[in-house]
Structures are given as C-alpha cells and as structure tokens.
Regions:
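N-terminal cap/lid segment of alpha/beta-hydrolase-fold proteins
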Residues: 1-28, 88, 162
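C-terminal catalytic histidine-bearing segment of alpha/beta-hydrolase fold enzymes
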Residues: 74-76, 216-271
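Short beta-strand/loop motif that positions the catalytic acidic residue
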Residues: 188, 193-196, 200
Length: 271
C-alpha cells in the first residue's frame, strides 16, 4: 500500500492507495474514492474517515480522506446567537483542488482519472453535493465522476441542519439560496448514490428526498436508499465506529456493497 499525506491549502489529504503486483496486474488503474467526513463544519469526524477508506480499499478502490477546513468548535457549545468565522468558500475550494490533485497524479496513484468518486457524510455530504452542483466554477479537471452522499445536509430551507449552514455561510442571507443545493442540480451533476435513515433526528431524511427529486427532474442517474432504523452519524454501522452510548445497527451494514454495485454499474468496471 502507498500511504502519504498531502497539504491541500490548509486541508490535509491522507491517501491510501493499493499496490499493484506482477502476479495480478502491475498496470492496474483503479477507481478512486475521496472521503469527506461529517461534523457539522465544527470538526471532521474520525468515525467517518480511515475505517471507511480501509473498507473500500478491501473492495478494490484507492481511497483518500480530506480533513477540510472547519471551525474547530465543540458541537455541544454551538449557539445560533453567536458569531463564527464564515467558512465559505474555503472548504469548496479545497475539495475542488483535491480532485485536481488526484487527477493530476493518477499515474503515481495507480488511478483511472475518469473514475473519481467523492463521498461525503452529513456536512461532508453538503460539501460534496456543492461541488456536484458547482464544479463548473473550478474547471473540467475538478469534475467528480460520481458522488455518494451519506445522510447528507442538503438544504438551507425548512429541513436545514442549522449548525452546518450557519457555520458555512454565517449571517449572509445572499448565500442562503446557494446553500440550498437541491435548487442547483443540473444535467451536469454527476451520478449520485444517497442513503439516509427515517429515524435521523439531526439531519431529517427530507434533505435526501429533496436532492433525489432534483436529480430525477434533471435526468441524472441516482439511487436513493432510506433505511427504516438508525440515528444520525452511523458511519459503517459496525462496533468499530459506533459511539459507546449508541447501539450497533446491523440493518445498515450492507450499504458499502450497495455503493459498490452502483459505482461498478456507473463506471462499467472497478478497474
């Protein structure tokens, strides 16, 4: 395995690339998944980072995790009445530059430049979907080939996750429409897999429904999976990544295989 760390502006990219071998295929070019943990733009959750990368490594994907710019506050201390440093557009620029980095280093990273997926959890899902909607601002080399959104923050409207939206755009009312990503899906938005749970009380599942509907209206290939059970922030749903105060949720543990099926169908092959 090739493991390396790269600075993308103020963000840190941790790369996990599978080695190629003569007795398998020394020239294999794999699909690449870049993972963006959640954390409400307060922090980047470690529960949605390395363990996820290693899970998809085991399925044949090269992976990386981007620890993007956040406010570095405890979510329990967040208050809507406080003023915070506005993050936008720094995380979005970091994301675009990450795709550009991977695409420009494809030979070194044993990667197919036309099979780059961005995968985001919660607020990381908002970050990912924002590039899916707006990648044209950053150029063709920043275009993701597919997206995976896990219990994503999508809207700044009725079902908004207030903390995430506030920390991203602050009090700037002019940016509220921009932050409602369901309004900006187009036929240029890449194929997307979305999953969430009906019991999510932090980021209502309606966020996912809004985005799926927008994808449908624009004829973008997508798959939406809504699990009946499970709270917010499940990650892989295994004991390894489950908080000590929450139960393991076996019902959602099949999602990596479902994502794999979607990506193989989208790319026609994993290699």
């Amino acid at each position: 395995m090739i493991y390396k760390e790269v600075q993308i502006g103020e963000a840190l990219l941790r790369i996990y690339v599978l080695s190629n071998y003569e007795d398998i295929d020394i020239n294999r070019k794999r699909a690449f998944i870049i993972i963006y943990p959640g954390g409400a733009y307060c922090r980047c959750s470690n529960r949605e980072a390395e363990t996820v990368a290693i899970k998809f490594n085991a399925m044949g994907y090269n992976c990386a995790v981007l620890f993007y710019s956040v406010n570095n506050i405890d979510k329990t201390e967040y208050s809507p009445s406080k003023q915070y440093k506005t993050l936008y557009p720094k995380p979005q620029i970091e994301l675009a530059n990450t795709i550009k980095y991977v695409r420009s280093h494809c030979e070194e990273l044993n990667t197919d430049p036309n099979k780059i997926t961005i995968m985001g959890f919660s607020a990381g899902g908002h970050l990912v979907a924002s590039l899916g909607d707006y990648w044209m601002k950053y150029g063709e080399d920043a275009k993701p080939n597919a997206m995976v959104l896990w219990y994503p923050v999508i809207t700044s409207g009725q079902y908004a996750h207030e903390c995430s939206i506030h920390l991203l755009i602050g009090e700037d009312k002019a940016l509220m429409d921009m932050a409602s990503l369901e309004k900006h899906v187009s036929q240029q938005t890449p194929p997307t897999y979305i999953w969430t749970t009906k019991e999510d009380q932090a980021v209502p599942y309606e966020n996912s429904l809004l985005y799926a509907d927008a994808l449908s209206q624009n004829n973008v290939p997508f798959c939406l999976k809504v699990y009946e059970k499970g709270c917010h922030g499940l990650s892989l749903g295994t004991q390894e990544v489950t908080e000590s105060t929450k139960p393991v949720v076996p019902e959602i543990q099949d999602w990596p295989e479902l994502v794999d099926e979607f990506l193989v169908k989208t790319f026609r092959t994993r290699f």
